């Protein structure tokens, strides 16, 4: 699973996920992409589950790029622990997703195969997505 090798700070503030993606919002590497139209968080497990679904469907053909990385630590306290005593320890990592962000890209397969692979991947994700193709002259 994806996670940072080392962080400057182990814990982060919660923050607010606002605005739209101004970077990483075009098909840059492959011919087809899965773009987020919703807002939310994707955990490292969800990113990996979607990647596996796509990889299984396209079998040996094509190439997949993961355009997001879970770099935000989410902390939680153990069960049945009273409030106070500081912030909990990091449990897992998430990627904050804004609308318009390109999540995955694919190349070397037909459009029908890519569309079906992305449909299977989208079923594993908690946010709304749309299939996009590379624009000519982009």
Curated annotation (Swiss-Prot):
Residues 7-16 have a biased composition (Basic residues). It comes from the Bacteria. Gene3D superfamilies: Ribosomal protein L10e/L16 (3.90.1170.10). Residues 1-21 are annotated as: Disordered. The keyword Glycoprotein does not apply. Keywords: Ribonucleoprotein, Ribosomal protein, RNA-binding, rRNA-binding, tRNA-binding. InterPro entries: Ribosomal_uL16, Ribosomal_uL16_bact-type, Ribosomal_uL16_CS, Ribosomal_uL16_dom, Ribosomal_uL16_sf. HAMAP family: Ribosomal_uL16. Belongs to the universal ribosomal protein uL16 family. NCBIfam families: rplP_bact (TIGR01164). PANTHER family: 50S/60S RIBOSOMAL PROTEIN L16, LARGE RIBOSOMAL SUBUNIT PROTEIN UL16M. Part of the 50S ribosomal subunit. This is Large ribosomal subunit protein uL16.
């Amino acid at each position: 699973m994806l996670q940072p090798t080392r962080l400057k700070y182990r814990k982060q503030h919660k923050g607010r996920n606002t605005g739209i993606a101004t970077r990483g919002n075009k098909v840059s590497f492959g011919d087809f992409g899965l773009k987020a139209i919703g807002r939310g968080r994707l955990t490292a497990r969800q990113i990996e589950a979607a990647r596996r679904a796509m990889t299984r469907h396209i079998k040996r053909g094509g190439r997949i790029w993961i355009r997001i990385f879970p770099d935000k630590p989410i902390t939680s306290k153990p069960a049945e622990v009273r409030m106070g005593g500081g912030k909990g320890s990091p449990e897992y990592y998430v990627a904050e997703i804004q609308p318009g962000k390109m999540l995955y890209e694919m190349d070397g397969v037909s459009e029908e195969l890519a569309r079906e692979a992305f449909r299977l991947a989208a079923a594993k994700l908690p946010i709304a997505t749309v299939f996009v193709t590379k624009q000519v002259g982009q």
